Regions:
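Long, basic N-terminal domains or extensions that often function
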Residues: 1-231, 273
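Short flexible coil/turn linkers enriched for glycine and charged/polar residues
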Residues: 8-11, 21-24, 32-36, 47-53, ...
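Conserved phosphate/anionic-ligand binding catalytic regions in large, soluble enzymes, centered on
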Residues: 26-28, 36, 120-138, 327-350, ...
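Extended amphipathic alpha-helical scaffolds
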Residues: 1-44, 48-49, 230-366, 551-565, ...
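Short, hydrophobic beta-strand segments
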Residues: 111-113, 183-188, 229-234, 245-254, ...
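Mobile "lid/hinge" segments at catalytic clefts and subdomain interfaces of large enzymes
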Residues: 138-258, 446-544
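Glycine-rich, flexible beta-strand/loop modules in the N-terminal catalytic cores of phosphate-handling
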Residues: 24-108, 113-120, 179, 186, ...
Length: 799
């Protein structure tokens, strides 16, 4: 086994090879803290036809790396997550251009996260491990690529910040490069200044050189001999010179044709003419002419830029294409905008949802929820092509993530705007910089939707064309498709007037001095301000009102110890509230309750119910309630939403009440006073007597003379019982020992000879209370002074 170590960011980074995955062409294990990543590199014999590099990159974060079992039914990892796809792109972008020219064999790189400590993100480790696996293998990958992450905390640059530090950082920058140059940049930021970004580039490159040196040391000890690759151009310089002499002027005119499709048709017609002049049987000459055509395009494109200072569409180097903006273009969406810049057009929509609709993300660190999503779609018609429309490709996921990172820092805190936000950007036309159009359209659509952004965000794609001499440099603002394809840099910059919020850069040339990078960033800022001026002219602040079709969110705070009262057993109570009111309800662990509804009345009803469930009735307090249910022994009165109590028939008036319905009906509003609350069950006893005028002497005497009910109880001083279900004027049971099954002093049964289940009259019931369906029901009624639950009903004091 071979091993190398390096101190970086205050921690030890080690790379080792030779112990595991020994049948791969190249394999290494990288460790940083307790995060461990295995990377392998393999190739297949046989040259693949075509002009592309047949490279496949796969990256997997096993949940066992964090000591977890995957969720879901199958309990194993499935298709790649968005984080894994983005990391694949992060590995692929710097490595793909770095293979020896002419190498065209199927190559696969696999990165596996074997252990994760939750502090060191494995993405940059995977880049370093993948490069090391290639460097020590037979695969012709001559120069190592290394990567670091840069943070910016309290005005200080931090190398490889931990995840906890990243939460505090104003900059989250990943930089990859060779010992000589930076080749790839990916960043999100909180409105940082361009000078901070330049300093971060410099600090990153210093660490990259050290990491590359470590890879070269490992190759010197454990590297395998490289495959021999012979690159033979399909064309000769003489052929290019010949064709340029014959068709150069025509090609130059065709390249400067206005309009993407018009230019494409002109170039295609000229190419067909040139190839048609070659005899069909001369296949070698045909292949050489085809290759020479591509070289001619490159030469004329660069000559226009560097010698004539012209762009193919006639713009100056700093000029932004014409911009048109429309907002509120779709009637039913919560927010919408069409942003058009030249021949690139994005239809961007915003949908507002409840906190429950946030995106659930599961990885080796556990479950998290993402409240802001941006989905980017690139249908084939946007470039006039015919293709199958399947799920989003890696490119679409990458572009959507870049646009999301650009907008996310400007969102209001969740405490101020609790909505889940989903943006969808559908590219309707594309001629370069569609991801930056998505940023602009997303900012406009959120403003129109009423999202209180801290500031508008715009983005612009910068390009670069370099010549043979150091001074031959053209920095291009708002590049179009051909400039992206033929140029030396694709540098996307998004931000506000104050600073940068997102960066993405891929460089095809070796070594860009700080001065050129500074000029590119300054020119990008000028372009960004120009675009923001256009956006502000269309909509300068967020709408005062949300769309009528957007849900309204209402937030209340309840005591944490009352959350269970809102949820109920198995979620029964909250489901009832949702069904009763037609709202959506989310209860957080801290007691924050969010109610979502399009109807204000329904939302207020849900709020009242929740407040009622979590409020506490107080003994001696008067309440105005509504009669919800009537039983022979009393009425159940709702004194607060979701809470009711028993108003016994004996507590309805000072005098004797024959039937409950003589006094009140269902739906009546009555004023009552809480006279008792059972400590165990929380059931509430109500009375009207304290609120009624005291009886006159005549009324009291009349009540005393009133005949008692006739019943089988005979001369009992409690009056007749009225039979099962009849009227009873019994009042609550005294605290004399509980219910039937308790140890109360009930006395012996008076009729010892009567059968237990006699169906005849029961003349000697005495002072025993009614029989219920079960002993437990009787005990509950006795303890609470209320009827027990019978037949599945709920006769308790609280609903």
């Amino acid at each position: 086994m071979y091993k190398k170590e390096l101190q970086i960011g205050g921690r030890t980074l080690s790379i080792e090879t030779g112990a595991v995955a020994r049948q791969a062409n190249g394999a290494c294990v990288i460790r940083y803290g307790d995060t461990v990543v295995l990377a392998t590199a393999c190739y297949k014999d046989g040259v693949v036809l075509g002009d592309f590099m047949p490279l496949t990159v796969d990256y997997k974060e096993y949940t066992y790396a964090g000591g977890r079992i995957p969720g879901g039914f199958f309990k194993r990892e499935g298709r790649p997550t968005e984080k894994e796809i983005l990391t694949c792109r992060l590995i692929d972008r710097p490595l793909r251009p770095s293979f020896t020219k002419g190498y065209r064999q199927d190559t696969q790189i696999i990165g596996l996260v074997l252990s994760a400590d939750g502090e060191n993100d494995p993405d940059i480790l995977a880049i370093n491990a993948a490069s090391t696996a290639l460097v020590i293998s037979e695969i012709p990958f001559p120069n190592p690529i290394s990567a670091v992450r840069i943070g910016y905390i309290d005005g200080q640059i931090v190398i490889n910040p931990t995840n906890a530090q990243r939460d505090l950082s104003d900059l989250d920058l990943v930089v990859a490069g060779t010992p000589d140059a930076i080749v790839m940049v990916e960043a999100g930021a909180r409105e940082v200044d361009e000078s901070v970004v330049l300093d971060a580039f410099e600090a990153a490159h210093n660490e990259i050189r050290r990491l590359c040196a470590m890879q070269l040391e490992l190759r010197a000890e454990a590297g395998k001999p490289k495959l021999e690759v012979t690159y033979t151009p399909k064309f000769t310089a003489d052929l290019v010179t010949e064709l340029m002499g014959q068709h150069g002027a025509t090609l130059k005119d065709a390249m400067q044709t206005k309009g993407k499709h018009e230019r494409s048709h002109a170039l295609k017609a000229l190419k067909t003419q040139i190839l048609g002049a070659v005899a069909p049987e001369d296949t070698e000459r045909l292949a050489a002419t085809h290759a020479a055509w591509a070289e001619m395009e490159v030469q004329i494109f660069r000559d226009l830029m560097l010698k004539e200072k012209k762009r193919v569409d006639g713009r100056s180097f700093t000029e932004i294409r014409p911009i048109t903006i429309e907002t509120n273009v779709l009637p039913r969406t919560h927010g919408s905008a069409i942003f058009t810049r030249g021949e690139t057009q994005a239809l961007v929509t915003v949908t507002l949802g409840t906190p429950q609709e946030a995106q659930k993300i599961e990885d080796f660190e556990g479950e998290t929820f993402q409240r802001f999503m941006l989905h980017y779609n690139f249908p084939p018609f946007s470039v006039g092509e015919v293709k199958f429309m399947r799920g989003p490709a890696r490119r679409e996921i990458g572009h959507g993530n870049l646009a999301r990172r650009a907008l996310a820092p400007m969102l209001p805190p969740q405490e101020e705007f609790a909505y889940t936000i989903r943006i969808v950007s559908d590219i309707l036309e594309s001629n370069g910089s569609s991801s930056m159009a998505s940023v602009c359209g997303g900012s406009l659509a959120m403003m129109q939707a009423g999202v209180p952004l801290r500031s508008a965000v715009a983005g612009v794609a910068m390009g670069l064309v370099t010549g043979e001499h150091a001074g031959d440099v053209a920095i291009l603002s708002d590049i179009a498709g051909m400039e992206d394809h033929e140029g030396d840099m694709d540098f996307k910059v998004a931000g506000t007037r104050k600073g940068i919020t997102a960066l993405q850069m891929d460089i095809k040339v070796a070594g860009l001095p700080r001065e050129i990078m500074a000029r590119a960033l300054a020119q990008a800022k000028d372009g960004r301000i120009h675009i923001l001026d256009k956006m502000d002219a269309a909509i300068s602040t967020h709408s005062a009102e949300l769309s009528e079709y957007a849900p309204r969110l209402y937030t209340i705070q309840i005591p944490k110890d009352r959350i269970r009262d809102v949820i109920g057993s198995g979620g029964k109570t909250i489901r009832w509230i949702v069904e009763e009111t037609g709202t959506k309800i989310d209860v957080a662990d801290d007691g924050k309750v969010t109610i979502a509804s399009n109807d204000v009345t329904s939302a207020n009803r849900a709020i009242d119910i929740i407040k009622g469930l979590t409020a506490s009735a107080e003994i001696g307090t008067n309440y105005k309630g509504t009669v919800k249910r009537i039983e022979p022994y009393g009425a159940f009165v709702e004194i607060m939403p979701g809470q009711d109590g028993l108003l016994h028939i004996s507590e309805m008036a000072h005098g004797r009440v024959g039937q409950v319905t003589d006094v009140m009906q269902i739906g009546d509003e009555v004023e009552v006073q809480v006279v008792g609350i059972e400590p165990d069950s929380g059931k509430i006893r109500l009375s009207r007597k304290p609120l009624l005028p005291p009886p006159t002497e005549e009324e009291a005497a009349a009540a005393a003379r009133a005949p008692r009910r006739d019943g089988p109880g005979g001369g009992s001083d409690r009056g007749g019982r009225g039979g099962f279900g009849g009227d009873r004027d019994r009042g609550p049971r005294r605290d004399s020992g509980g219910g039937r099954g308790g140890s109360g002093d009930r006395g012996p049964r008076r009729d010892h000879d009567r059968p237990r289940h006699s169906s005849g009259p029961r003349p000697h019931e005495g002072d025993r209370g009614p029989r219920f369906n079960s002993d437990s029901g009787a005990r509950e009624a006795s303890d609470a002074g209320m009827p027990p639950k019978t037949g599945g009903g709920d006769e308790g004091g609280n609903s």
